[in-house]
């Protein structure tokens, strides 16, 4: 499965580009979390990962727009994958990171049993801390049965809109059955009964994290960077660049990919595409000076796809044995490949 990650694209924009995306050889589109989030007026790239609850509708589109997108995508032979943020909610800012924001839905905010301990992770190599404590945000206890009902009601609503798959944000921070948490067992059953699939990001390379990754693979595909090994390669979803590696630059992320050129990305992705069954290509923002969104007017991608670029793309990704022998096109294929 070849997935294109359309971070911060409005649903109506995606709908207009479906035919071109299909021509590029993709099987599925991954879109933003559809949950409401704080700070829409002062949008940052991470804003949609601080949700206010489990319902559909935000600046990228409402429930009806999601239904239309799914219907149109299916007409073009494309699956729709929605990013879901279940591990945490929006907080009260840096000075009060572990308490939910006042705009978080009352059914969550007012129920004390829904929340993890109000403390942060100190040892990121300690699996218990990473799954039981907060990650700079108010953590939700996904082992709570009442909370699970709310979450699965939301996932069912996504399915009813036509969604095919789910990308579980912060999956490595959600406990597994070996931790005494049954959430992903229920997720597996839900997806089986609803003919859906899902994947969750699991990072870390030591023995403890490899064990966590291998257990996760019993329930979801494992989303992990190039170089990760897994016994069942069909359970691996591989990427080289993600929104985190491109947008989250600074001392906390020395391995960012901002310096990669368009040629680097074309070459790397063409290789991954031939090496792995399941791959994701992240589309960078259109304006490198405004990396938080595609433009001021609504995250559009005007005139990105042109016929000669589509032909170039297909030749590079599908046919060329050596991408380095092909000259860089005058007009780049995807926004941000500067």
Annotate each PLM feature.
Residues 16-22, 33-35, 40-46, 68-82, ...:
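Active-site-proximal helices and loops of the catalytic beta/alpha 8
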Residues 1-3, 236-237:
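A residue-level signal for beta-strand positions that form part of recognition/binding surfaces
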Residues 2-16, 24-26, 30-161, 178-202, ...:
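Substrate-binding/active-site clefts of carbohydrate-active enzymes
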